[in-house]
């Protein structure tokens, strides 16, 4: 099955890698959709986010053995992209539910499934940035 996930992936950390490996293990290929720089700014993560530009974030993700395809999206959510590629499995981190995940209803309606992968490590890019800044 084709697996799809998305995120900002600004400063890749162990939690991201474990999550992506778990997502890939659910199927035969993993597509990772990455928020464009403008999309990240719309999310309200801070005026200086993303720390790493889109091309850098995509290159780092593409270098992971568990990732088969990396694509970017400009919208606030990847709903249109999810509907266009219609994966069999849509994956998000453990704090998401099908009700709060863009595109989940469409995937499920088409016979696919939504999977929330539990967080394996207590990691956060936002917390890491705050720590580096001494906050």
What are these regions (language model features)?
Residues 1-135:
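Nucleotidyltransferase catalytic core that binds NTPs
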């Amino acid at each position: 099955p084709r697996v799809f996930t998305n995120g900002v992936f600004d400063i890749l950390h162990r939690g991201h890698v474990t999550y992506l490996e778990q997502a890939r293990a659910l199927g035969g290929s993993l597509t990772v959709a990455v928020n464009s720089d403008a999309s990240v700014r719309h999310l309200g993560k801070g005026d200086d986010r993303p720390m790493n530009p889109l091309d850098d974030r995509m290159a780092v993700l593409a270098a992971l053995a568990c990732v088969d395809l990396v694509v970017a999206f400009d919208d606030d959510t990847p709903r249109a992209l999810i509907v266009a590629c219609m994966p069999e499995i849509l994956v998000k981190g453990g704090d998401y539910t099908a009700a709060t995940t863009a595109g989940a209803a469409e995937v499920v309606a088409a016979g696919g499934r939504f999977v929330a992968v539990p967080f394996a490590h207590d990691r956060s890019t936002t917390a890491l940035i705050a720590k580096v800044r001494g906050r």
